[in-house]
Swiss-Prot record:
GO molecular function, one term: nucleotide binding
Name of the protein described by the UniProt record: dITP/XTP pyrophosphatase
The organism of origin for this protein: Polaromonas naphthalenivorans (strain CJ2)
Cofactor: Mg(2+)
Residues binding substrate: 7-12, 69, 157-160, 180, 185-186
Family membership: Belongs to the HAM1 NTPase family.
Amino acid sequence: MKIVLASNNPGKLAELQALLAPLGLELLSQAELGIPEAEEPFRTFVENALAKARHASRLSGLSALADDAGLCVDAFGGLPGVDTAFYATRFGYAKGDNNNVRALLEQMAHLTQPGQRRAALVSTLVAVRSADDPEPLIASGRVAGEIALQPVGSNGFGFDPVMFIPEFAQTFAQLPVSVKNANSHRGKATAQMIALLRERWL
């Protein structure tokens, strides 16, 4: 079964291809099909993921899977949230993972006490059989941790180098990819999605 991933992010595509491999699904990126990115006008992950999935399905004629994910920092009232990908641009930097990390560390520099750097990575996955599917599959994963004082590790992407996970006493970027994938927000959401796909679509 072919499913289009409503994302142009190569890191996200590689991670989801690995996580969905047990189902034998062929996951194509929307970029391969010449599909432009969808608008993301909403303030919640689930609404944006649904909009992206419907957009990719409408333009490809295929079933679609979309992920909307982000970092929610307690000290910032849950922000940057749905604006995570563009976080650095709020502070004069170009869009990009390294600049997002730099901007976050600068904005959190004054927060040095235990508990002040709490944050969560959240992922919401939505799958639709068609653009007008009235019953989308929805899965959500969340991992709580703390923002490290500086980036550590070279695996992963996004905020992985500064997302310190107390249960492992390491950042996501320090963990082997297989361990990170099994325990990440996207890994948890994907496990739920796999169960839903098996139950309802396959």
